[in-house]
Amino acid sequence: MLLLADSGATKTDWYIGNNPTDGLQFQTEEINPFHQSPSIICTILEKQLLPHLPVSPASCHRIFFYGAGCKGEGCKRLERVIADFIPMAEINIYSDMLGAARSVLGNNEGIVSILGTGSNSCRYDGNEICDNVSPLGYILGDE
């Protein structure tokens, strides 16, 4: 099964399923490895994610997590925490911006924006983000 997450500053939207038409969708609070410690993330996964899973966590073979704060060392920390819960899965952690680009543009080139608690934009080449101006951050009111 596939486990997919889109996490922003206020919530995480989750999807679990074998294909786009047969899955289950639910929400937990936000998960941000830049602002949250591994123990806080662990508590969110244990108390909010696991109860929603309709199958054993071991049935999740591929995980794609797109989230705010997911870059550099934050990705590695989050991957280690998720691997503690679902150790046999292929775990992929990417930025929320790449998630937005992939969901809107697929394999096509273009510009995509996120307008939410935090705001951002980028140019996408159909595979990866190729140009991005660093936002001010939601604390400074980049919306």
Residue ranges and their predicted role:
Residues 2-6, 60-64, 110-114:
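Short glycine-aspartate micro-motif
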Residues 2-43, 129-130, 135-137:
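Short glycine-rich, Thr/Ser-proximal phosphate-binding strand/loop in the N-terminal lobe
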Residues 12-17, 102, 113, 119-125:
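Short beta-strand scaffold segments in enzyme catalytic cores
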Residues 19-22, 80-85, 110, 126-131:
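A glycine- and small-aliphatic-rich helix-loop capping segment at beta-alpha/alpha-beta transitions
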Residues 39-54:
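Short, well-ordered amphipathic alpha-helical segments that serve as non-catalytic structural scaffolds
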Residues 51-92, 104-105:
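Short beta-strand-loop/turn "lid" adjacent to the catalytic site in phosphate-handling enzymes
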Residues 89-113:
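Conserved phosphate-binding catalytic cores of ATP/NTP-utilizing and phosphoryl-transfer enzymes
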Residues 109, 121-143:
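Glycine/GP-enriched mid-protein hinge/lid loop-to-helix segment characteristic of carbohydrate kinases
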